[in-house]
UniProtKB/Swiss-Prot annotation:
Protein name (database record): WD repeat-containing protein on Y chromosome
Keyword Repeat: yes
Residues in WD repeats: 150-194, 317-356, 360-399, 450-489, 502-541, 589-629, 742-781, 825-864
Pfam families: WD40
SUPFAM superfamilies xref list: EF-hand, Quinoprotein alcohol dehydrogenase-like, WD40 repeat-like
Database matches in PANTHER family: EF-HAND CALCIUM BINDING DOMAIN 8 (PTHR44324:SF6), WD40 REPEAT DOMAIN 95 (PTHR44324)
Metal-binding recorded as keyword: no
SMART domains: WD40
Keywords recorded for this protein, A-Z: Repeat, WD repeat
Alphabetical list of Gene3D superfamilies matching this protein: EF-hand, YVTN repeat-like/Quinoprotein amine dehydrogenase
Region (Disordered): 1022-1044
Amino acid sequence: MPMLIQKSEVEYQTISSTQSHLAEEQSERLHRCISKEQLEKLHEAFLNAPERQVGIDDLRVMLEDLDITFNDSMYTRLFLKINQNRDFRVDWNEFVSYLIFGFQEEDPSSQKESLILPISVPPMVRKSEHRSAICCLALLKAKSDQVPIEEVTETVNFSFGGEDSPEASGMWVTASHEGMMRFWTSHMEPIRTASSESIHLNYAFYNNGKVHSKLILGDYAGNVRILSYSPHLRGPFQAKPGAALIEVVWSDVLKGKIPQFVPKEYISLHNEMISCVYFSLHMNALFASAEYRNTKKYRGRCPGMIMVTYDERSNFRIPLGVSTFFVAESHNIVVTGGPDTFVRIWDVYIPTEPSAILTGHNGGIVLVFVQPEENKVYSVDYQKIIKVWDLQEHTLLQTYGDLVRLIHHSETDLTYYYHSHLRELVVAGRKLISIKCCPRVRVDLTDGNTHAAPVSVVLYNRLFRNIVTCGLDSYIIVWDPWTGRRKIIMKSCHTKMIYGEIIDIEITAACFDPLEQFLLTGARDGSLKIWNYNNAVVVRNMSIMPDQEVTSVIWVVDRILAMGWDRQVTEFNDVVGREYGDPKKWPKFHTDDITCADVKLGEGVVTATYSGEIIFWKLETGQPYRRYSVMDPTRFIELKLTAEEEKSLRRSKRLASRPTHTGIHGLQMSRAGRSTVTNRPEDNRDYGANIPISVQAVLFLQTRPQTLKHGSVFISLDTGYIQVYSHHQRGGYMMEFLAVHKTGDCVLTMCTDRKNRFLYTGTAFGYVKIWYIVNFCVPASEKTHVCMPKLRLEFIFLRKELFLTRAKRAIRNQPEPLLVSSYKGHLKAINSIAFINLPKIVFTGSHDYSCRLWTQGGRYLGTLGTVLPWSKLTPFERAGDDSQTYRMPPDIKKVASSTTLKVISGLQAERMVKRQEGKVTEDRDEDTAQTEDVTELKRLLDSPIKEPILGKHFELPGRTVLDQHIELDTSQSYIAVYTHLKVHSTEMLERLPTPAVIGKVQAENYLHHYVPVEGKVDISGSSLNIKQPTRRRSGKTHDPRNIRTAKARLDIGMGLSSSHASQQ
């Protein structure tokens, strides 16, 4: 009895958002305000309590003794959050668990967990267009990857599309052994081809002239040399007049004969060949690595990598040495990989021991790189396997093996390059393969995704004031709609094992318990789970029938109802002590799969099928009392099972009681074989077995009474119409209305507000429509006056326009219900829609992987999971401001109609009204306006059009008068067509003489005009040895071109000698 008294005190309405709240939100999270001393006192109070449990009043007294007070509504909500056992008694474990959950929700690391794998986009493969395999791959950029510390900006995970420009992303350069170079765009589109016979180096300049560029050289003997120079005017690499090639001797650089270079040497830094070098601008340190494969010589105590800072050296000792490494300067870490197949993570200031060792590769590591903003490490081994690791938790996230399929097994000498700006890994060999690694979100194309698959169900929890989304990716995600943060993500919620592999099952239905403390989900394989979604714990597992999809779930007091492709309602107990008993099966009156269902609390349940059947049930007894068909809704259909149905029912019960094999059982219960369960004579198929119209959604209006004149049930059909029924025993079909404006569209989901004033619908084409249903299907005595000016202020859709739009034309002859808003919210179908009463927010879950929030007027608030800043929202104030200009979703902006643009943006284009002399156009009546329009058209169209009608254009030449007839020779087995063609003999064209000036220019060589200038370059004492190009000599001295060339050289020499004489 005390338990019943406490339970009656906590009413269902205490979690409703209709309660009066304070102007500012009063926090219900104790972890923010409770101290350590207060927590110890509470622990003592729980220990002294009887059975170490306290009730709702006792806990409030304990908190008030510690000066922690709440108002009545807030404390009731707090108690329901703490009481996870639903026994209205709280122990110490429940209280501490609630505090821990509060800290977990505020953990920023939960925001970084990705919904999809790091490498989820198929790779882009192109032919290299080289005759041999690519041996070198480089990136030609206008800006270096390293920037000074003062210029480092915060890294964001989205882009506005400008990263594709050559200035930002650069160009790819590939080279092969035959001396061919090819230039590619950032998207691997060929630009040009060049050939070279010299050795190429890859170097970059710092754009900031204050920072000196460094050229780092590592040789076979283990020496590292650094050349530092100023990048101003390209430093020592600028072109010299008259010099085709400049050779620099290293000994002269060390002696300082070239002032542009500042050399520095590290002799015998390693005992083996240098494999990789890197200079960190932020840490002012040099990193150099080498491989030590001779284990007998070095015995594993070799400095695989050495970091040099000024004159200090730090040795990172790694067995077999280091083949490649990556320095993440923002995290002060370095990741190494070598022939020992291990990936090591080091702190640059602790070289004695690695922070973590990542194992899993079966071959030597050839490439490692880090994404600091994503906290991910990528490693590639010799066997072309890519592994992705979490940088903080040091766990394996993904193993990517598509390179083994794309590249031949004999091709092992590959070249890798990671583009940090585009986040692409390019693999070059005989093919060019581009792999996107955690690509940034293009906010110019999309606002991001909520799930990794279509969103199936969206719900609003009034107790915790958060949004729960379920998707076909088997994810359950809890969102805070007021900040846009993701609180909890639960992956692989429904699974099954097939041939030893665990497969995720799509979530198709979900709902909350009456007090909204737990979540019930149904999956495509017929499984049901009850979740304590605050800690991602499964409380209970259930199932309706194997391999039969659950399409709808209902949770009322002490009972759970589930229905789906098994064509009947299954009832589970929700009473303590009887929850694990056998479920109760309601009578099987449906002849096809159940697609949707809804409940009217305390009165009844309505279910609808794929064939258009509708059955009303008593909620208390589970007995049907009315049956309809949407094709003929006014016809009375008797609720009676035929002899064949009864016989089939008895047979199915006998088969269910026998132990059967899994394969045969799954075959019998599959949807493909559903016709075997409903075999009936042809004359008995009257209830919609062959009806093409299916029911997509049903909705009970909770505030309307069960009378004959109140339309309380809305039935959505796939034809685009919504039928209205009365769920009274002597009620039935009342009327229907068209709910779409496009052919082929239909309403897939519906919901209403708390007082059933507005009907919110989501269609298969992605449209959101709002209907005003206060005076729709109610007695005349209950109809109220509609204040249209007030509705026009809230819904811009109702304001008049110059032309009647398509959404309004579709319902111009439909007086009720009143369409108050219509706009395109998604590119794909809307699978679920819900409404938050107090802030007036509509949120929709779509097949395009997103869940979007809208104001009731149609303004776009945001997409859950977006990378953009979130709008300021509160659960106690109405969302939206008429003075604010709202943005549009990028994907909708490209396809939006004028109505969608007006509704989402909240702006209406000014009507251009033509004024005439002495009167205003708006005041004209309809007849006068029609007469003037006809007069204007006559004035434009009655006058003859002036020639030429098409204007001046090119005229085709006329056809020849003579008709050329060709007689074909058909005497042979085939017709020699070419023998009948008239072929004219070619004539030699007269070649015009080449002017003497052009001939002279063709014979010249630009190198003949450049000779060393005395006074600027000292050939004898300088370290720069300028090689003059050898002049070509020809044996044909009588050639006039050679005579002209020799004469030109003589003239140039005389001019130079005279100029020197004048200078002296």
